[in-house]
Amino acid sequence: MDTETSPLLSHNLSTREGIKQNTQGLLAHTIARHPGITAIILGILILLVIILIIVAIVYYNRSVDCKSNMPRPPPSYSIQQSEPHHHFPVFFRKRKNSTSQQAHIPSDEQLAELVHS
């Protein structure tokens, strides 16, 4: 009696073993019966995987290029950045318009007022 055709003997195998053998048998049977169709299907699957990888690489490179090639603002344009979080009180923070950051050059009128006073 053949073990593949006997339902009682194949039932004694574990379920996983039985499914594995049935799947392998079906796949081998299909490949042996239709080698051309199987080759075409495998070729299509391989091409799809290659195309998917290429699309993923191009998409990733495009997103990286978009981030790195953002137009730079002119130097006179100031970007407000959020201040970093410090653990000391607010009054110790640097002021944005402090005299150390901006050089204040007095005009001639202001110099004349200082001389007269």
Swiss-Prot record:
Keywords: Glycoprotein, Host endoplasmic reticulum, Host membrane, Host-virus interaction, Inhibition of host innate immune response by virus, Membrane, Transmembrane, Transmembrane helix, Viral immunoevasion, Virion
Membrane-protein topology: Single-pass membrane protein
Cellular component GO terms held in the UniProt record: host cell endoplasmic reticulum membrane; membrane; virion membrane
Cleaved signal peptide residues: none
Entry keyword Signal: no
GO biological process, one term: symbiont-mediated suppression of host innate immune response
Residues the record marks as carrying a glycan: N12, N61, N97
Domain of life from the UniProt record: Viruses
Localization per record: Virion membrane; Host endoplasmic reticulum membrane
Induction description: Expressed in the late phase of the viral replicative cycle.
Transmembrane stretches, start-end: 39-59
Keyword Oxidoreductase set for record: no
Family per similarity comment: Belongs to the asfivirus minor capsid protein p17 family.
Subunit structure: Interacts with the minor capsid protein M1249L and with the hexon capsid protein p72 capsomers; these interactions form a rigid zipper structure that stabilizes the capsomers. Interacts with host STING1.
Function: Together with the penton and the other minor capsid proteins (M1249L, p49), forms a complicated network immediately below the outer capsid shell, stabilizing the whole capsid. Three copies of p17 encircle each p72 capsomer in the inner capsid shell, anchoring p72 capsomers on the inner membrane. Required for the assembly of the capsid and icosahedral morphogenesis. Additionally, inhibits the host cGAS-STING pathway through its interaction with STING1 and subsequent interference of the recruitment of downstream components TBK1 and IKBKE.
Protein name as catalogued: Minor capsid protein p17
Organism: African swine fever virus (isolate Tick/Malawi/Lil 20-1/1983)
